[in-house]
């Protein structure tokens, strides 16, 4: 799994940072999943190596403009481009009314299948919102001025390495039987011998995981969702010095994000959603926020637009 940041600013865009959006690339299935879609996101796609034709799912954290104003334009453009994949959208229950109103009033034609999955705060804690053979997506409510949700994506464990030499030594004929054994299935050969696939496979290979957490102040729900994740992407709107503002506006400081990362025992933390007040050259700069976070959680990076991160697995196993 690979992350591409398409927008890392809070509230309004700057010359170097667009507002919130990030893409998750799933090369094994030629799909893209988008998390938030601030104004100008489709322009950011054009400046990246990502293809909107692969876009399959969009996850919206909350209904503030810097996270959703790019959505109607992107959806309309997908229709004009003849997107045939269809689109699933996940987000607060108000998302449907927002899109219905804009698309209807602008006479925008959505020519592809679209389904909106509305989320409610009361029933969303650690809620599974999508699952298939490869991935599990979970959400949880956050603490913000409007209903907001964090998302976690877990890649399911893969079968362990198949011992081909052992199978050959036992004169098991190659072909579809090897595939069955690799999946852990019990196979009966024509000569009557029975083999358990688990006897030919090493330990399961843990899948990668990441959590996207914005907008929120420090939240126990976020801590629980992030437990053991390989990568935590967490908002850091304010510096520790401006923690009073963070509490007033229900945002996080860099140190709050680092505290979540440390207590959740994640592999890596990336700070995003930075206030424009911390532009380079100002008294407090983005690098100062990074230093604050690293004093608590050393394996921290500062997001910037078009930064790409290959999610690296670490040994921690999430509690269930």
Swiss-Prot record:
Q: Give the top-rank taxon of the lineage listed in the UniProt record for this protein.
A: Bacteria
Q: Which Gene3D superfamilies match?
A: Ribonuclease Z/Hydroxyacylglutathione hydrolase-like (3.60.15.10)
Keyword Oxidoreductase present in the record's keywords: the answer is no
* Co-factor note (free text): Binds 2 Zn(2+) ions.
Q: What class of enzyme is it?
A: hydrolase
Question: What does the record give under GO molecular function?
Answer: 3'-tRNA processing endoribonuclease activity; zinc ion binding
Active-site residues annotated for this sequence: 66 (proton acceptor)
- Any idea which positions bind Zn(2+) 1? 62, 64, 144, 215
CC cofactor: Zn(2+)
Q: Which Pfam families does its entry note? A: Lactamase_B_2
Per UniProt, Zn(2+) 2 binds at 66-67, 215, 273
Per UniProt, the keywords (alphabetical) are: Endonuclease, Hydrolase, Metal-binding, Nuclease, tRNA processing, Zinc
Q: So what does this thing catalyse?
A: Endonucleolytic cleavage of RNA, removing extra 3' nucleotides from tRNA precursor, generating 3' termini of tRNAs. A 3'-hydroxy group is left at the tRNA terminus and a 5'-phosphoryl group is left at the trailer molecule
Q: What does this protein do?
A: Zinc phosphodiesterase, which displays some tRNA 3'-processing endonuclease activity. Probably involved in tRNA maturation, by removing a 3'-trailer from precursor tRNA.
Query: What HAMAP family has UniProt attached to this entry?
Result: RNase_Z_BN
> Under what name is this protein listed?
Ribonuclease Z
Recorded name of the encoding gene: rnz
